[in-house]
């Protein structure tokens, strides 16, 4: 019986405690002139994630999105969103925890951030903007690979 209780205590657990908007900004630096031009934007998306340990098994993960739309040489709009979540994560190895914080949690947060960006752009009276899905697993794998390459480079230097 004690063995079963011990196994349950070690079983991986993942819980979302809260998802919230930490910060947001929407700017149209060239309005109203930008509305007078033909709409042919170049949209750029920058992503960043970070995490903070709040307690032994509780983490805050912050997904930052910056969307910049340029119409010709002029910036049509700049939208910055920080979507955050508080997650309870227990029973994972260090590698599994790093993956959860760097890929799984951002995957959970992205739909909320994408919706917020779309709403802000719409309220700015620009045409609808639907951000494409992001493969955070691939981005995290690329990040790990870059860190390993940098560590190898330092070791050989």
From Swiss-Prot:
It is found in: Cytoplasm. Its main location: cytoplasm. One of its GO terms (biological process) is protein folding. Keywords: Chaperone, Cytoplasm, Protein transport, Translocation, Transport. One of its GO terms (molecular function) is unfolded protein binding. InterPro entries: SecB, SecB-like_sf. One of its GO terms (cellular component) is cytoplasm. Belongs to the SecB family. One of the proteins required for the normal export of preproteins out of the cell cytoplasm. It is a molecular chaperone that binds to a subset of precursor proteins, maintaining them in a translocation-competent state. It also specifically binds to its receptor SecA. Homotetramer, a dimer of dimers. One homotetramer interacts with 1 SecA dimer. PANTHER family: PROTEIN-EXPORT PROTEIN SECB, PTHR36918. This is Protein-export protein SecB. The lineage of its organism: Bacteria, Pseudomonadati, Pseudomonadota, Gammaproteobacteria, Alteromonadales.
